[in-house]
Amino acid sequence: MLLKQVVEAHAASNGSAGARSIAMMVTQAGIPLSRYRAGRRMKQLGLTSTQPPSHRYKKADQPHLAIPNLLDREFDVTVPNKTWAGDITYLWTGARWAYLAVVIDLFSRKPVGWALSLSPNTDLVKKALLMAYESRGEPKGVLFHSDQGCQYTSQGFRQLLWRYRMTQSLSRRGNCWDNAPTERFFRSLKTEWVPAIGYPSIATAKSSIIEYMVGYYSSLRPHKHNDGLPPNEIEKKYWNAQKAVARNT
């Protein structure tokens, strides 16, 4: 039974999970398993973690706007839909690069909006924000943080933030650590899931990335920020606690 759970956890991660992640996933499934025991079982089964090095997308900064870094690396957010962070990366799709924009809720580190396109333009980040806004029930007063990429400082994107009544925050120029959660998400995506040679087509890339974000990262993958729980589980825990409080008031 244990060996079967280890194999299933490894397969669910697309072969990327190491002993620590497999131990958390199997334990969450109801079978207590330590990291070291997971490592021994992986060795017994001939399972390894395949995580190639990442490659960062270079962005064009637009530092002329007087928009402060309101987030100021305060990444520990206690409420969903309070602070979102956006970023762009690129993926090889057979004959050319495709560009992925995501929106991450910093409470759970869950990707709540995304868009994939052959052009890293303003429409790309607007589509990702629109998806996040609609899928999260059109929340009010969200702080949206990003780097100073031209897509995020464009008039079109800033107007969309204004329409949604969101406040904009920008990283300092050239400082990737000001948006560390999205950088870490992209690193996880590329090292855990994306094939080393990329995808054969943009359609294949889209299907695979959705599977990662929805089926694995949000639902199954243990996250250190959430004390080992996947984003969906930590959000479920939060909302259940809110319902309990409401019943008792």
Identify the role of each PLM range.
Residues 96, 115-137, 143, 153:
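Active-site beta-loop-alpha junctions of metal-dependent nucleic acid enzymes
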Residues 73, 77-112, 118-119:
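An active-site-proximal beta-strand-loop segment
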Residues 1-79, 175, 230-241:
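Basic, flexible linker segments flanking DNA-binding modules
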Residues 58-62, 146-148, 154-158, 170-190, ...:
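RNase H-like two-metal-ion nuclease catalytic core shared by retroviral integrases
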Residues 162-166, 188-249:
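C-terminal domain-tail junction helix/linker
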Residues 6, 22, 38, 42, ...:
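Mobile genetic element proteins and their domesticated derivatives, centered on retroelements
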Residues 108-114, 168-170, 195-196:
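Short small-residue beta-strand/loop micro-motif enriched in glycine and branched aliphatics
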Residues 12-15, 75-77, 93-94, 148, ...:
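Conserved, non-catalytic sequence blocks in retroelement Pol enzymes and Pol-derived host proteins
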